[in-house]
Amino acid sequence: MNALAQKTPSPPTLVFTEAAARKVKGLIDEENNPYLNLRVFITGGGCSGFQYGFTFDEAINSDDLVIEKQLEEEDDDEGGTGQMALVKLLVDPLSLQYLQGAEIDYHEDVSGAQFVIRNPNAKTTCGCGSSFAA
């Protein structure tokens, strides 16, 4: 058998859900700056040793992982406009080491709304959800 035929596709480095991308798009629209991208990063600190951070960034560094999500623009009615919007998630190489295989999602329920990171590399997490140990 051909060695190339035996290769299985590798799982995505990071998953950026449609719910998260739609929320980011809405926040970018509120800022009225189409050049903004969402950057997710890891810093030292928090209850468990590391914590997640989010910020908007116009700059894309040459070594950033860039995950693009195409979204159909929504209008006020039930259907879409047919126009597409591109939302970008940026991760620096150091943070990517801790986020490999993670999912960036956005969740709304009766207790509130927040971005959620489901990280398979987190050995323990804090009750606040923004701190973890690797």
UniProtKB/Swiss-Prot annotation:
Residues that bind iron-sulfur cluster: C47, C126, C128
Record's cofactor remark: Binds 1 iron-sulfur cluster per subunit.
Mitochondrion is among the record's keywords: no
One Pfam entry name: Fe-S_biosyn
Gene3D superfamilies xrefs: HesB-like domain
Single Gene Ontology BP annotation: iron-sulfur cluster assembly
GO molecular function annotations of the record: 2 iron, 2 sulfur cluster binding; 4 iron, 4 sulfur cluster binding; iron ion binding
Cofactor: iron-sulfur cluster
Keywords: Iron, Iron-sulfur, Metal-binding
One GO cellular component term noted in the UniProt record for this chain: cytosol
Domain of life: Bacteria
Function: Required for insertion of 4Fe-4S clusters for at least IspG.
Subunit structure of this chain's protein: Homodimer.
Family membership: Belongs to the HesB/IscA family.
PANTHER family: IRON-SULFUR CLUSTER ASSEMBLY 2 HOMOLOG, MITOCHONDRIAL (PTHR43011:SF1)
Protein name as it appears in the record: Iron-sulfur cluster insertion protein ErpA
